[in-house]
């Protein structure tokens, strides 16, 4: 991983799977997690599969827009968007919308390894010039932070939903592969998630 110059010189390179396990350990039972494509949702599936998890399949850049929709539709539910840096670069417009409407129940976690990992490790703009925390702050998400280390991540996650607006955390991570493979069944994923949010009906898919 090649890291750009960012306004956080003490940031450590962390492991995505470990951070995901720490995130899952902090979840309350009713919180929804929308995970972006590839290793981001593979690690979430491995760390703790639950009906409130939504795993993206091929829709790069849509974790934040979907999480925003859930947060606005169910304002009493905590919602977390778990996204990679390459995917968030495809959805920068969504950050401006989040910065404008400021849903206090939304947390965004960006795993930044500076590459498009599952397509061949091509270099992303985050490895050269783009600072996603600075971009988020510029978009109006004032409570945006680089994660310094694993303990700092847990501390920041513990105070999510306590402030008056959304929280965005970005972590520099290594390029280790995913720790599991999410079942690629869109209907099953959708139905379980709807059931987890209390909006779906009982189905044969709820195995």
Protein language model regions, located:
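Short acidic, glycine/serine/threonine-rich loops at helix termini
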Residues: 44-47, 119-123, 180-184
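Glycine-rich beta-alpha junction loops
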Residues: 37-40, 113-115, 172-178
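Active-site-proximal loop->helix
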Residues: 93-101, 118-135
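Thiamine diphosphate
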Residues: 43-112
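Glycine/aspartate-rich loop-and-adjacent alpha/beta segment that forms the canonical ThDP
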Residues: 1-7, 14-18, 29, 50, ...
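General beta-strand structural signal in soluble alpha/beta enzymes
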Residues: 33-37, 55-58, 81, 145-148, ...
